[in-house]
Amino acid sequence: ITGNKTKTKIKEAYKKVLTHKKAMGYILSVSFAFSGMFIFIEKSSFIYMEYFNVSAKLFPLFFGSNVLMMIILTKVNMKLVQNINPSKILYSGVVLQVISAVFLLLFSFNANIYTIFISMIFYVGSLGFIFGNAMALALEYFKEDSGVANSVIGVTEFKIAGVIGFL
């Protein structure tokens, strides 16, 4: 928040952000994606090392492959946004994440390391299309209140991640 905004103006700014349907859609999309990342960070060692008996020596390769895919898709995103509307790229990222989540769910009933690994790579990798685009699209509506909007994004990300992680 810049300048000396009064409490009333601050409340108005928060209300403006929280009631903006399009912006909240972007905020929720980045928040649910953020939750998926938290769950991956929290559960991946159990899934790979305990469930699939991946050694402690090999686990960093499995974990790092997911991060590498996210980096690759972030770099691809940087090129794509020069010519393609960020909302279309975001949509593609969300679709990729949902498809990957469905495969994870389906494969979990008859899990093998290969199907889970490939599904996880695309699930985590999709964040490269989601994070930057959803943030930019949400903040686009709040040029004067970008600090407030950014704080709403941060709080929403952690609240949703906390609730989903707890479940």
Model-identified regions with their sequence ranges:
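Juxtamembrane intracellular "pre-TM" segments in multi-pass secondary transporters
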Residues: I1-I27
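Transmembrane alpha-helical segments of major facilitator superfamily
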Residues: L61-M70, E157
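Short amphipathic helix-loop junctions that connect adjacent transmembrane helices
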Residues: E42-K57
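Pair of pore-lining "gating" transmembrane helices in MFS-fold secondary transporters
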Residues: L18-I39, I121-G125
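Helix-to-loop junctions at the C-terminal end of transmembrane segments
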Residues: I72-S87
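A late C-terminal transmembrane helix in Major Facilitator Superfamily
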Residues: G125-G128, M135-L167
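Small-residue hotspots at the loop-to-helix junctions and early N-terminal turns
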Residues: N53-G64, S151
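C-terminal transmembrane helical hairpin of 12-TM major facilitator-type secondary transporters
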Residues: S87-A134
